[in-house]
């Protein structure tokens, strides 16, 4: 029997393989590394919609890939919740993924803070 985690990993590999035709190997590698970080980081976390956080992040990334967004935007989408789960997220993302991905995640985080503030 295949576990949900094994099935999820296989689905991610299949999706990444499909991306290889649209991106250079280094770009696909950046997206793959984002998935590798997000997998354990988001494990067991649930979105407000009730969906697993990783599933939500990958679904959003898949939509953006279909819109021909760049690899850094796709990686940032996958890592959008990192500030909630990593104390040193800014330094880590900049070191591992570059300044652009870090800035995009920071922007997503700020938009979420604004959304939460507006609900008060």
What spans do the regions from the language model cover?
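Active-site helical microenvironments for divalent-metal-assisted chemistry
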Residues: 1-120
